[in-house]
């Protein structure tokens, strides 16, 4: 009986030793590890919270300049938004999300803005051609399309100074904030014309047709007409109409033919006649 008792005691001691060794930790050690893990998780949560706060600050700055009429604070707001964006880490930039703001506002690569010319220089002279466009924040497109038109006009009329204005303040702010390129809106451009002593002003819009942007342009120009000896405003590309329905605007005809050809091709037909035979109709809206 005594041997059995001793054996049981030794077994219990051995099991206790194994438990302490196998489990490896005392209650105090486990408690400390749990506390450390919670602290690490808390620090991680705090870091995420700080990242989001910084991203939200930039989102608010972008939203403030995204859609607005130009005011005395616009220049500073644009530079502040870009400066705040530049301070973010790559991870924080991905968190930027607002009513209109997102990482693409500053982060998307749209080409080299240095290849563009804002054409907002003074020393205009007496004769000016003001090219008015809605605008685009895509740098490569702006250089190829809008600048391309402006350059062509300057080549065709070397005695006139060609300048630029955009009607979309949302585009102007975006380009200025992201690339530091300042493009005049219509009022700024007209004020520049007046201060430079322009006498003869020709306004060449790049709008395709009559619409809100063109109507707003006409309203703004009306307030400045008495400040020049002559003001001429060209029609939109597809804005001219004939004296009656029988007179067709050749520009409209050419555009309609190009659109039709492209639509037929996209639909998988070799010709418009083939589409007709198949019972397919194309509606342009």
Each predicted region: which residue ranges?
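Beta-rich interaction/scaffold domains
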Residues: 45-109
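Extended amphipathic ligand-handling, pore-lining, and cofactor/metal-binding catalytic surfaces
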Residues: 47-50, 102-285
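Bacterial lipoprotein signal-peptidase II cleavage site
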Residues: 19-32
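Low-complexity, Pro/Thr/Ser/Glu-rich flexible segments characteristic
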Residues: 29-49
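Short, flexible helical or helix-coil boundary motifs
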Residues: 16, 65-69, 197
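Bacterial Sec-dependent N-terminal signal peptides
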Residues: 1-9
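Hydrophobic core
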Residues: 10-20
């Amino acid at each position: 009986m005594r041997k059995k008792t001793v054996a049981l005691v030794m077994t219990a001691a051995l099991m206790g030793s194994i438990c302490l060794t196998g489990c490896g930790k005392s209650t105090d050690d486990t408690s400390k590890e749990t506390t450390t893990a919670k602290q690490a998780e808390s620090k991680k949560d705090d870091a995420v919270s700080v990242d989001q706060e910084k991203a939200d600050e930039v989102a608010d700055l972008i939203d403030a300049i995204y859609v607005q009429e130009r005011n005395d604070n616009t220049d500073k707001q644009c530079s502040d938004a870009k400066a705040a964006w530049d301070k973010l880490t790559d991870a924080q930039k991905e968190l930027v999300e607002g009513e209109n703001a997102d990482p693409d506002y500053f982060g998307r690569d749209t080409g080299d803005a240095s290849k563009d010319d804002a054409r907002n220089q003074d020393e205009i002279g007496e004769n000016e051609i003001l090219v008015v466009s809605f605008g685009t924040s895509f740098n490569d497109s702006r250089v190829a399309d809008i600048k391309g038109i402006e350059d062509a006009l300057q080549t065709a009329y070397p005695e006139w100074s060609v300048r630029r204005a955009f009607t979309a303040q949302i585009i102007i702010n975006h380009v200025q904030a992201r690339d530091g390129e300042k493009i005049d809106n219509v009022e700024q451009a007209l004020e520049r014309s007046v201060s430079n002593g322009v006498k003869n002003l020709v306004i060449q819009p790049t709008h395709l047709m009559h619409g809100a942007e063109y109507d707003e342009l006409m309203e703004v120009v009306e307030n400045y007409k008495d400040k020049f000896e002559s003001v001429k405003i060209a029609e939109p590309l597809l804005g001219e109409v004939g004296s009656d329905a029988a007179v067709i605007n050749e520009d409209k005809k050419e555009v309609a033919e190009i659109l039709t050809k492209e639509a037929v091709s996209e639909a998988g037909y070799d010709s418009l006649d083939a589409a007709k035979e198949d019972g397919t109709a194309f509606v342009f809206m």
